[in-house]
């Protein structure tokens, strides 16, 4: 379930979900199931190597011997909607179970969220690639002064150009016009599970300033939804489970 009428309903659902998840996990370890996955070993190896190589210069570890600087990644086959590779952190030997950051550790998505949260909804609400938007400094309704990170402004620009230059102010203007409630509804329907009430309140959400953030699994599934003509498919690497 992805759609909730209130925060309390969502919290209650999550509690029941966690309880059932724990029960299923116990059964998984004791019932002798055969589990078939969509993981592609070659893609998995490449993704793990990409994460490890990108962070190889960061060697500091915590008291448990785990690297402090981490990353995650998720790769989805757009034809099937299945996860073919998922990396929850840097590869280490003899560590045992660690947090799978790909779906358990939200981080700020930054500008990567703009197409999912603002531009795709804009297209569904009558905008086109040629529609114009003001790319000039502005103040939002919640009193935030918004500027472009690169410090340049172009006045009236097309939606296409706004995406190309990743304009903060153009994105914010569209977000204000559509309203946070309208835009965030799209993330709700794609099961972005770390949304909070504050994310609906502050306009900086649309440029990646979430309270908790998103996961690489959520982001990959979101972009896979764009490729699938707007139809969301829940990301999973499980193909089937048998008892014999």
Language-model-detected regions and their locations in the chain:
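Non-catalytic, structured segments within soluble enzyme domains
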Residues: 1-38, 188, 193, 204-208
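Conserved, well-ordered alpha-helix/loop/beta-strand core segments that scaffold catalytic motifs
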Residues: 18-64
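Active-site SXXK
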Residues: 47, 81, 108-133, 162, ...
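A short, well-structured edge-of-sheet supersecondary motif
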Residues: 64-95, 190, 239-240
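Short active-site loop at a secondary-structure junction
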Residues: 66-71, 94-116, 129-135, 204
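Conserved catalytic neighborhood of penicillin-recognizing serine enzymes
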Residues: 127-183, 232, 244
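Active-site-proximal helix/loop microenvironment
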Residues: 193-244
């Amino acid at each position: 379930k992805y759609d909730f009428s209130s925060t309390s309903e969502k919290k209650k659902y999550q509690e029941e979900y966690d309880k059932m998840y724990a029960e299923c996990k116990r059964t998984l370890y004791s019932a002798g199931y055969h589990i078939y996955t969509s993981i592609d070993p070659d893609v998995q190896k490449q993704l793990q190597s990409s994460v490890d190589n990108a962070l190889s210069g960061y060697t500091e570890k915590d008291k448990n011997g785990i690297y402090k600087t981490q990353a995650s990644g998720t790769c989805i086959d757009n034809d099937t909607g299945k996860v073919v590779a998922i990396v929850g952190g840097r590869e280490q030997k003899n560590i045992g179970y660690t947090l799978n950051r790909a779906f358990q550790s939200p981080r700020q998505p930054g500008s990567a969220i703009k197409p999912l949260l603002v531009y795709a909804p804009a297209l569904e609400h009558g905008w086109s690639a040629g529609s114009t938007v003001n790319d000039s400094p502005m103040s939002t309704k919640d009193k935030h002064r918004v500027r472009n990170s690169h410090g340049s402004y172009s006045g009236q620009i097309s939606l296409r150009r706004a995406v190309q230059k990743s304009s903060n102010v153009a994105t914010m203007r569209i977000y204000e016009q559509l309203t946070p409630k309208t835009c965030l509804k799209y993330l709700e329907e794609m099961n972005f599970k770390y949304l909070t009430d504050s994310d609906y309140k502050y306009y900086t959400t649309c440029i990646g300033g979430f309270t908790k953030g998103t996961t690489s699994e959520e982001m990959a599934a979101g972009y896979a939804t764009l490729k699938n003509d707007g139809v969301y498919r829940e990301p999973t690497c499980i193909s089937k489970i048998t008892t014999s």
